[in-house]
């Protein structure tokens, strides 16, 4: 396990890596009853996450295969590593009526998957392909719309204070505050991204072209969590700015 995860980390330095948080990790089993699991799975999965792996599961909505053990495992990693959702039931083929949740329709299955994803604060929803994708749009389109507006990360500045007039060569103060309307987070903290995304400000000329730009290196998008606005004071120096009107 360490050999293969180390190999991926070594060679995929710019691409996010993802691992399934399965209860039988490396144990040669797929399932042995809801109450059973390999106690070593948590240690192995934690080691992968600490190396920079993100998390996914392919049984969301299945009350047996995505049970309390899976829910408990992912909790400490929420907002530390992004979580990806894939539903377990293929509604056109699987006997989803047997699920302990008592699903009666395909819409019920989609609701169960969505609610499990909301609980895990997932960043992405995998609609699969073919009939499964069609089911999401046919049977549960309002949930698709909800994920677009609520899921993952939805970042916006609700306050930006800048001076109206500035003097070239002077240092100005910009106060900006950011909110996340999504239940997920922007995973700039994963090693493959390594904080590569930051907030920047620019002066635009009358043709709406960027002529000067300033990067606020103190911003960390991964800590912007829903319900907790984050504020910054940025004091760039306007070196070499020509006299004029900018936006």
Residue spans for each PLM region:
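Internal, hydrophobic beta-strand segments that form the core of beta-sheet-rich folds
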Residues: 197-203, 244-247
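A beta-strand/beta-hairpin structural motif
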Residues: 211-242, 247
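Catalytic cores of secreted or luminal carbohydrate-active enzymes
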Residues: 110-163
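Structural beta-strand segments of beta-rich domains
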Residues: 170-174
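Catalytic-core regions of glycoside hydrolase
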Residues: 2-131
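Short coil-to-beta strand junction motifs in C2/discoidin
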Residues: 187-200
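Short, acidic/polar linear motifs in exposed loop/turn regions
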Residues: 180-184, 207, 238-242
């Amino acid at each position: 396990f360490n050999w293969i995860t180390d190999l991926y980390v070594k060679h995929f330095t710019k691409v996010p890596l993802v691992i399934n948080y399965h209860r039988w990790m490396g144990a040669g089993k797929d399932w042995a009853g809801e109450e059973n699991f390999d106690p070593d799975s948590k240690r192995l999965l934690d080691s992968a996450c600490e190396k920079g792996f993100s998390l996914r599961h392919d049984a969301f909505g299945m009350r047996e295969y995505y049970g309390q053990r899976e829910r408990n495992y992912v909790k400490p990693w929420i907002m530390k590593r992004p979580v990806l959702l894939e539903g377990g039931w293929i509604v056109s083929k699987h006997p989803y009526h047997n699920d302990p949740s008592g699903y009666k329709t395909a819409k019920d299955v989609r609701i169960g998957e969505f609610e499990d994803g909301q609980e895990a604060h997932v960043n992405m929803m995998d609609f699969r392909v073919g009939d499964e994708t069609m089911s999401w749009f046919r049977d549960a389109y309002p949930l698709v719309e909800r994920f677009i507006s609520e899921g993952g990360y939805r970042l916006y500045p609700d306050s930006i204070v800048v001076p109206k007039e500035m003097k070239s060569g002077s240092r100005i103060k910009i106060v900006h505050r950011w909110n996340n309307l999504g239940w997920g987070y922007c995973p700039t903290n994963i090693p493959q991204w390594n904080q590569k995304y930051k907030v920047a400000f620019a002066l635009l000329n009358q043709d709406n072209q960027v002529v000067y730009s300033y990067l606020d290196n103190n911003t960390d998008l991964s800590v912007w969590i829903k319900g907790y606005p984050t504020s910054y004071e940025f004091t760039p120096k306007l070196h070499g700015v020509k006299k004029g009107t900018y936006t």
